[in-house]
From Swiss-Prot:
A zinc finger (C2H2-type) spans 314-338, 483-507. The gene is Dnajc21. Keywords: Chaperone, Cytoplasm, Metal-binding, Nucleus, Phosphoprotein, Repeat, Zinc, Zinc-finger. Residues 3-69 form the J domain. The modification Phosphoserine is found at S283, S302, S370, S512. Interacts with HSPA8, PA2G4 and ZNF622. This is DnaJ homolog subfamily C member 21. Signal peptide: none annotated. InterPro entries: Chaperone_stress_response, DnaJ_domain, DnaJ_domain_CS, J_dom_sf, Matrin/U1-like-C_Znf_C2H2, Znf_C2H2_jaz, Znf_C2H2_sf, Znf_C2H2_type. It comes from the Eukaryota. One of its GO terms (molecular function) is nucleic acid binding. SUPFAM superfamilies: beta-beta-alpha zinc fingers, Chaperone J-domain.
Amino acid sequence: MKCHYEALGVRRDASEEELKKAYRKLALRWHPDKNLDNAAEAAEQFKLIQAAYDVLSDPQERAWYDNHREALLKGGLDGEYQDDSLDLLHYFTVTCYSGYGDDERGFYAVYRVVFELIAKEELECMSEGDVEDFPTFGDSQSDYDTVVHPFYAHWQSFCTQKNFSWKEEYDTRQASNRWEKRAMEKENKKIRDRARKEKNELVRQLVAFIRKRDKRVQAHRKLVEEQNAEKARKAEEMRRQQKLKQAKLAEQYREQSWMTMANLEKELQEMEARYEKEFGDGSDENEVEDQEPRNGLDGKDSEEAEEAELYQDLYCPACDKSFKTEKAMKNHEKSKKHREMVALLKQQLEEEEEQFSGVQMDENVLNANSEEEMEDTPKQKLSKKQKKKKQKSAQNFDDNFNENGTEEGGKIAPEKTKSNEDNAKELENRPQENTCITETTEACEDPKSEAKSVPKSKGKKTKDVKKSVKAPAEAQPVSDVLISCATCHSEFPSRNKLFDHLKATGHARAPSATASLNSVTRNKKEKRRSR
């Protein structure tokens, strides 16, 4: 069978106009009426031209013909197709060549012909615009970079241009409808892709087989290994020389004068002396003592004793810190934090001393006024803010107490109740008691408390009782407060004056328990009588 494009004498990518012109020209030439001398041959040729134009003028027929052109030319689609392509399996053995020379049976000549045939088959399946150059296999003397490497780089990624349409099982022209045609095309496409994949893998495996036995590749690999070994040897030699050079420099190295510790210590001492002279820290005597060498006692015991004395001299009890040098101790004593800690320590000591001196005086007052005994709470260390608050609260309490005492003393009338007079006389007649403070207890009590103490009852009698309670409370004049010392019987206008007197004279002594109990019981009896 002759190719339709060859019958019309056009290229495979010819347009419709070119096909029409070629057909008219050949039809006039081979028409039987114009070839009476050779009518049989002209009729046969005219049939081929007519059939070719009929197929190529129809777009669908032309597309199908392009896809199945190779199969049609080699026997058709009826199963009579014979694949005349090169059998590559024959070249996977070492018996296909003899030696690695350049003769006809040599390794390079045999495989050079094989790849030229494969390239020729691929060019037949390509269009004129898609033609590409296939690198040659070369010979035994070919250069690796210009011939061998490009050849293997191309053929190791080989991809055939054949469509393998002769492998199709279904003729889409015989489909009854378009759905059946699509199903046929889908199955045919799977078959073609499978055949194309097998062809590509076969060629790539052949390339790998040849490359493994190619002497040019082996020589190049050996050359690369030698070059790498030479590079490693040179690198090791350079590293060894560098190490020897560094060792030699280390032997010749000398310490610079500015790096020695002796000069550094001397410069440090000079710097300290300059700063002390400028800012006034330290004295000249201390500088001389620090610069002079210390000729201490010999022996370990003398050194330990010296260190202990130095540690005691350089210890700050206020801040609970120890220092290594006298300069550091002096600088610390000049610091603001040290001065604050010293002032705080003095303040704490003064407060503790005052509290210790006033403990027994407070106990005497509490025992005289009530039966309960107050226990002293342990002293806690307070912060600055807490101490300031405590001092302010104590000062306010004393001021309020003085004001209340003087005001009440001014308001109390000179009239005294019988119970208060008895209490005062009894306290004055006690020689064993040191301190006794007699005040009008009933005058200080609130009239509301007296009114509350009256039992509730209904009727006119309760009203008379309430009036009788309110009347003496309102009409009772306020008496003066009697504050006297039980030892010397001196009277004072306020408690602060009495406390100052007790501190100065030392008359504060604890009263006997029986006397305090008798005074309390007698006061209770007098209250009951007054009710």
